[in-house]
Amino acid sequence: MSEKNAYAKSGVDVEAGYEVVERIKKHVARTERAGVMGVLGGFGGMFDLSKTGVKEPVLVSGTDGVGTKLMLAIKYDKHDTIGQDCVAMCVNDIIAAGAEPLYFLDYIATGKNNPVKLEEVVSGVAEGCVQAGVALIGDETAEMPGMYGEDDYDLAGFAVGVAEKSQIIDGSKVKEGDILLGLASSGIHSNGYSLVRRVFADYTGKELLPELEGKQLKDVLLEPTRIYVKAALPLIKEELVNGIGHITGGGFIENVPRMFADDLAAEIDEDKVPVLPIFKALEKYGDIKHEEMFEIFNMGVGLMLAVSPENVNRVKDLLDEPVYEIGRIIKKADDSVVIK
């Protein structure tokens, strides 16, 4: 018995792995940007930092996955957008530190290589990279029979960005009186899906719930996470924002305090938060306490900006979208986030 046949009998399809590599090359090519060195398939991805033109570069890195949202992608057999979620979760964290994302690497683990399915996943990764302006310089697909079921896979991503040292956003510039501006989310994004799946466990996904304005439930649940890089970068370059919060797992309560020092707090006007229909549906069908919703979900705001009052109009002018003035920074009394 040859080694090749022995490996196949253990559940690893080497030929399918080669096919995956060939299928994804055209998607990787879409993400090319200045600074990329070498080609996909080497032992390490390379990037020439001098091409960024940054004078005092500080590298900022991020890694994340998409949690159990993957289980819905598998359940509904829709794999072409989940990669965008993975990119978004990484690059949105990087932009919150004031850095421009440069490149991205993904890791896919599966029980059985399915070249068509994995190409769909990577096509979504590439689309996310294009939206974020980052290069996909590394991809690892691990076939692990016995670790995962044949139809199962997991997806993780890694991103690196660069910031001018003087433009790093670390919370130290946020001050009392700053205005909190919210940028709309596209939906649930990629957090809270263990609860989401429990709430809708008995649904097929084809339902047209009255709250969802004519959209099928599965389409709303799998709406890809919005990528904020191109919206936020011009604001960072002009030094118009004092703090940025990426509203992910833990919702407002956990993420907003990460924007500022411990002696400050955020006062949020709930009436000005653009709550999306899916959150109203989750609260209703899941019998979730209203205040708990803000502890779990983004509630319609995926990125929050702390801006000096004199810069608010300029920020609104630069953002080609609705901007929601949802609160302000105050001196901390008890809680770090006060929702009124």
From Swiss-Prot:
Keywords noted in UniProt: ATP-binding, Cytoplasm, Ligase, Nucleotide-binding, Purine biosynthesis
EC number: 6.3.3.1
Localisation: Cytoplasm
GO cellular component: cytosol
InterPro entries referenced in this protein's UniProt entry, alphabetically: PurM-like_C_dom, PurM-like_C_sf, PurM-like_N, PurM-like_N_sf, PurM_cligase
Any GO molecular function: phosphoribosylformylglycinamidine cyclo-ligase activity
Catalytic activity: 2-formamido-N(1)-(5-O-phospho-beta-D-ribosyl)acetamidine + ATP = 5-amino-1-(5-phospho-beta-D-ribosyl)imidazole + ADP + phosphate + H(+)
SUPFAM superfamilies documented for this protein: PurM C-terminal domain-like, PurM N-terminal domain-like
Pathway: Purine metabolism; IMP biosynthesis via de novo pathway; 5-amino-1-(5-phospho-D-ribosyl)imidazole from N(2)-formyl-N(1)-(5-phospho-D-ribosyl)glycinamide: step 2/2
Record's signal peptide: none
GO aspect biological process, one term: adenine biosynthetic process
HAMAP family: AIRS
Family under the similarity heading: Belongs to the AIR synthase family.
NCBIfam families per the UniProt record, alphabetical: purM
Protein name per its UniProtKB record: Phosphoribosylformylglycinamidine cyclo-ligase
Organism listed in the record: Streptococcus pyogenes serotype M5 (strain Manfredo)
Gene this chain is encoded by: purM
